[in-house]
């Protein structure tokens, strides 16, 4: 049944949902990659669609910006609409010199300055990690398409405009591949409610150098990331 944030019914969503932050990006994915896509949510403009990819039913829906927003949608998709796997597809900023623009990053783990997972885990540190099989399938899908990917820790920040830029030094020291704002929350929600999750991000800018991709470059690399996500779903079905 419908929730306060999703006006869909059970069965409207596939068991796997791709989730970009931008709802218009969700619309683009549905129109570009899915066959027979239909709109299944439009509450607050957070568009969701369900269609098929190579005959496999798949959904895509925006999750907004930040852990509070994405946590609402992830939780409701899992508990109210039977979603089993969530793949976040978005952008991230790099802090390490060896991580370049347009690199595709697979978030094996997600560090965070948010307290949401401590709230879940009785004020202890919770290791927010992706599902191993989903990570492996994404890596295999990338290899099959001859796309180089980076696999490791990312950082989910609560603030886009940070008052503590020295934290980037710490991130670099600890090998953080990219900074974004949602993965740790999605991983925590998935763990709490018995689902699986993965974040795949494209490096759209470099925090250290100020370098940025052009809109055309972002579009091309974004498409590679989406193809990796979709193909990984098919690989998961064959396990």
Swiss-Prot record:
Family label: Belongs to the PNP/UDP phosphorylase family.
Residues annotated to bind a purine D-ribonucleoside: 5, 180-182, 204-205
Active site location: 205
Reaction(s) catalysed by this chain's protein: a purine D-ribonucleoside + phosphate = a purine nucleobase + alpha-D-ribose 1-phosphate; a purine 2'-deoxy-D-ribonucleoside + phosphate = a purine nucleobase + 2-deoxy-alpha-D-ribose 1-phosphate
Name of this protein: Purine nucleoside phosphorylase DeoD-type
Entry's EC annotation: 2.4.2.1
Site (Important for catalytic activity): 218
InterPro entries, alphabetized: DeoD-type (IPR004402), Nucleoside_phosphorylase_CS (IPR018016), Nucleoside_phosphorylase_d (IPR000845), Nucleoside_phosphorylase_sf (IPR035994)
Keywords associated with the record: Glycosyltransferase, Transferase
GO biological process, alphabetically ordered: purine nucleoside catabolic process
Assembly: Homohexamer; trimer of homodimers.
A GO molecular function held by the record: purine-nucleoside phosphorylase activity
Entry binding sites for phosphate: 21, 25, 44, 88-91
One CC-aspect GO term: cytosol
Record's function text: Catalyzes the reversible phosphorolytic breakdown of the N-glycosidic bond in the beta-(deoxy)ribonucleoside molecules, with the formation of the corresponding free purine bases and pentose-1-phosphate.
Superkingdom of origin: Bacteria
């Amino acid at each position: 049944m419908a929730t306060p944030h999703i006006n869909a019914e059970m069965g409207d969503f596939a068991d796997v949902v791709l989730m970009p932050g931008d709802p218009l990006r969700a619309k683009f994915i549905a129109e570009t990659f899915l066959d027979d896509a239909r709109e299944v949510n439009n509450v607050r403009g957070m568009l969701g669609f369900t269609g098929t990819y190579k005959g496999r039913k798949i959904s895509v829906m925006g999750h907004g910006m930040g852990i509070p927003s994405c946590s609402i949608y992830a939780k409701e998709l899992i508990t109210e609409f039977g979603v089993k796997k969530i793949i976040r597809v978005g952008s991230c900023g790099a802090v390490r010199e060896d991580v370049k623009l347009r690199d595709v990053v697979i978030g094996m783990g997600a560090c965070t300055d948010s307290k949401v997972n401590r709230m879940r885990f009785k004020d202890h540190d919770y290791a927010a990690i992706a599902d191993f099989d989903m990570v492996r399938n994404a890596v295999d899908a990338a290899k099959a398409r001859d796309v180089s990917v980076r696999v490791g820790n990312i950082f989910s920040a609560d603030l886009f405009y940070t008052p503590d830029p020295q934290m980037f030094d710490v991130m670099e020291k600890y090998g953080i591949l990219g900074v974004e704002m949602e993965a740790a929350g999605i991983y925590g929600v998935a763990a709490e409610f018995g689902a699986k999750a993965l974040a795949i991000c494209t490096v759209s800018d470099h925090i250290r150098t100020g370098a940025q991709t052009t809109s055309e470059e972002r579009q091309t690399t974004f498409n590679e990331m989406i193809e990796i996500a979709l193909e990984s779903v098919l690989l998961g079905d064959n396990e």
